[in-house]
Amino acid sequence: MVTQNDYVLSIEGLTVSFDGFKAVDDLNLYVDKNEIRVVIGPNGAGKTTVLDLICGKTKATEGSIRFNNMELTNMREHEIVRAGVGRKFQNPTIYENLTVFENLEVSYPKGRTVMGSLFFHRTGEVSEKIRDIAAQILLSDQLDTVAGLLSHGQKQWLEIGMLLIQDPELLMLDEPVAGMSAKEREQTGELLKRICENRSVVVIEHDMDFVKSIAHRVTVLHQGKILKEGSMETVQNDPAVIEVYLGH
């Protein structure tokens, strides 16, 4: 039997209300170590709100969010990041005028800030870490490329790399393959499978073929509640899921 202490992420009784409307309603969600959990559901189901609650952008009305048994609900966003939770939003937030190498360097936790770059002393350790991450995100041959010149898919990978260099134990991604080519989607799937060997990944996604290729478990949200949870096959064949989501 798995206890709460064994989960990387343990959410219990989570509720958030906006002007009386419950965007998330008494949610219970448990994510294992090294798991890729995909959250799906119709627009307005509460998917992005759940990520906002986990990373501290939105505060819960009720309930508990525990990461490695650490309560997050009263922590600030930067404290949650430092604890080991990384969050990628739908649109890439990279420094378009910096090179790929510089984007990763700026993100290095003991590296430099954009304003403090004049005082930063680049070490061999930093350079080695950057090259390792670049290899993981398929950008080894683009380290000197200005980020604004990358393809849409490469920009998404770069932002994932900017999170990975901070070594989070939980990585949350909001629609990571939106706008990508078929080949980029396939490469992104392989990337996520690689990185979950050392961390847990929570993904919001609408592309069902992509979900099928990466998900260990799928959680279906509807009106702020869990409608169904299980393998992709279980979810796909559930009449209620077909009615509210997959049938549309």
Per-region residue spans from a language model:
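A short, surface-exposed alpha-helical micro-motif characterized by mixed small hydrophobic
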Residues: 211-213
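Helix-to-loop junction immediately C-terminal to a conserved catalytic motif
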Residues: 55
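The feature captures the beta-strand-to-loop junction immediately N-terminal to the Walker
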Residues: 40-42
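Conserved ABC nucleotide-binding domain
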Residues: 73-74, 133-154
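Catalytic Walker B motif of ABC-type/P-loop ATPase nucleotide-binding domains
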Residues: 171-175
